[in-house]
Amino acid sequence: MVTKTLTAPDNKTATRLLNVAETLFSEHGYAMTTVRDISAKSKVNQALINYHFKNKRGLFNAVFERRATVLLKERADLLRAAKIKAKKKPIPLKELIYAFVYPPLRMASEDKGGQSFVKLQARLHNEPKEIESALRAKLYDKVSLLFVDELKRTLPKLSESSICWRLIFIMGLYLYVASNTGRLEVISKGKAKGGNLKQALPEILNFCEQGFLSAPTQP
């Protein structure tokens, strides 16, 4: 008798499901995307979604974790490299900002899937609280807190509250820019290109650096 084993989630069928689900979730959100929608667009039987991911929430989590783990590893690696380079001194502010914003901007600029994931990140706060909170706690908190600690060393005159506020502003900024809505092209009359990483990165770094260097506003 042949025993059927569960196929690994990185096989062709599961990867196709992840790619299609990523696009649909980023465009319509968790609640408005159905298993039937994903099945129809991917041309994969609904039973195989349950086979690989158990249910819609399991698929959503897998979609999110697939790229988030890559992004966060890159972010942590850049931070680690900056710490080594600093030789126990505070890390230069612009290098901290670069380590934080470059991975998602790079990901969004390289392929359509990366851009879909950044859009998915941007709309995570609109998803059911139990899904949003669980994903943020599992995936993002550890690395984000590492950056808070390093920013406190680099900016000792800023309160932790101000540092966290300003870091949140940076998150909103890069998520909007990386989503490449086309708004930048409209208001600049085509002079600026939102999808151009070489153009966007220095603007973001300079803007965020000045934001962190502005006078403390909270005790």
Predicted regions and their residues:
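C-terminal peripheral helix-coil segments that are non-catalytic and often amphipathic
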Residues: 2, 138-219
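An amphipathic alpha-helix adjacent to DNA-recognition modules
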Residues: 11-19, 53-80, 136
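Helix-turn-helix
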Residues: 16, 24, 28-58, 62-66
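Short, amphipathic alpha-helical "lid/cap" segments that border enzyme active or binding sites
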Residues: 18, 94-101, 198-209
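Hydrophobic alpha-helical connector segments
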Residues: 77-114
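Amphipathic alpha-helical segments used for helix-helix packing
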Residues: 94-99, 111-138, 181-186
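Short alpha-helical scaffolding segments that buttress acidic/His motifs in well-ordered protein cores
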Residues: 100-104, 118-125, 170, 174, ...
